[in-house]
Every structure is written in C-alpha cells, then in structure tokens.
Amino acid sequence: MRRRMGAAALEMDAAPGSSGQTQRRATVAARLPSQHWPQRSLLIVAVDAHTGEPIVFDRHSGVDLADAVTASTAGPGAPPHRIGDNRYIDGGYRSPENADLAAGYKRVLVLSPLGGRTRAPLDWGMHLAAQADELRARGSRVETIFPDSNSRDAFGVNLMDPSTRPPSARAGYDQGRALAGQLTEFWH
C-alpha cells in the first residue's frame, strides 16, 4: 500500500528546485515556531516514495527541520518532497500515530487526530491498538486521546486546511482542559 501511494505521488513529482516544491517548503517553514531542531527528542516520520519504507528523521539525520516536516506532510494530492536524491511522502502512510516509536518510555501519551483509524493491513502491526498493546507489553503506561465531537467538527475533513486552525486550537484547548485532571493522574 505504501509503495502504491508513493508511486501515485511520484507521478505528480515536481522537478528538483521547482517553484512548487520551493513554495511548499517555504510555507511549511513559515509555520514552524523555529527553523532548528529542538534539543529534546523529536521524531518525524516520512515514507520513501520509491520503496515504501518508512524513515524517521531527527536532529541527527542531517536534514533540516523544515525538510523533514515538509516530507512528512506530503500527503494525498501533493508530489513527494525531495531531500537529496530521495523523495518522501506523508509519514501517516506508515501509521497516523507512530506510537511504537515511543518504545522504552515509562509513560506514553498518544494524541490520535484520526481516532485510531488507519488503512494499513492488520498484520502490519501499525494499528494504534496493536502499537499500544506492544508498548504495554514492554512495560509502558499508555494513554490515548482521541478528538471529541467538538474537535472533530472543528478540523473537518481536511486536516491540512489552515483555515481550520483557530477553531481546532480552541476545541483542542477546551478538550485538554476537560481532560487535565485525568492526564495529571497519568503523569504522576
């Protein structure tokens, strides 16, 4: 499935340095709070459009933060993002949450904007329930947060639509305040 999605994206591939890729990267970079990788651990997942294999970018990858985010969000209807000789598509094709990357942590809080849904085959082990079960089997406490109805209504069907940001932020803030007590218990 990831290879098929990559092949579809490659059909729309823009030439290296084309104005489309340059503009998309500039848009992503402008939305970031910083152009530098944070010192704390941040893992950003993308999928190699040629092989379908996932790649995890971090501050040690030798890739600019803006490129990692642009690659990780090159979703349906967008060409893959080029980094060097490679082309990458949305890391959500691997898993919308990628919770398994938190293996080894005592507590794992998963924010699942798609409510745990995925199109990946069950035997891939990329469904959120399977990832959470594996984390628990390794000793992690896992808490999952799914959007409530107000949050789902606020972000609508296109998660990348910038016009939904303000209402989504308000709805998420309200949901977070409602869950604050539960999450305080989880962290202590």
Describe each region flagged by the PLM.
Residues 1-188:
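Patatin-like phospholipase
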